[in-house]
Amino acid sequence: MSNFYKLLKEKFPRKEDIVTEMINLEAICQLPKGTEYFISDLHGEYDAVDYLLRTGAGSIRAKLLDCFDWQKIVAVDLDDFCILLYYPKEKLAFDKMNLSASAYKTKLWEMIPLQIQVLKYFSSKYTKSKVRKQLSGKFAYIIEELLAEIDRNPEKKSYFDTIIEKLFELDQVEDLIIVLSQTIQVLIIDHLHVVGDIYDRGTQRKN
């Protein structure tokens, strides 16, 4: 028992630290249950498993239908937006090649607020500290600011827009969109359980 108290004191040196942790853990238990994903027989199925993880086994699309009224968002196609969330690098490269420069920039302007709203919706079941850990170090502060301002308080709309415009000036918008998509992919599945064969004998086994 003395060893137990010694270890406890190392992690929580003050009484206040223990109380804070107890409150935090109790509060976490009251949050909505995160999505758990069980998967097995991964051998030789890298591409299929990669697709399932990127799409959350279909959960991302289902959540998007809950998050938005797509009949009112006439400027954005649901399937097109889903592809951006699943394969951001490839989708951006495709759009950049097939759209004019002005049309491409307009599309990026439309995507970022939607991505931020999706991220805010997906992260609502987690604590702020857990969400913060998933954010890229490069864009962590910016994403937190955008999440805080996405409701577009009229008095702060220019603040939100200025952040995005500066990202365009610094040629960082594409990187931000990629990070947002990858973060959404991570947050859609809270726990991943591999319950069967994990040895991949396929061509992509190193991944």
Model-derived regions, located:
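Feature recognizes metal-dependent phosphohydrolase scaffolds
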Residues: 1-207
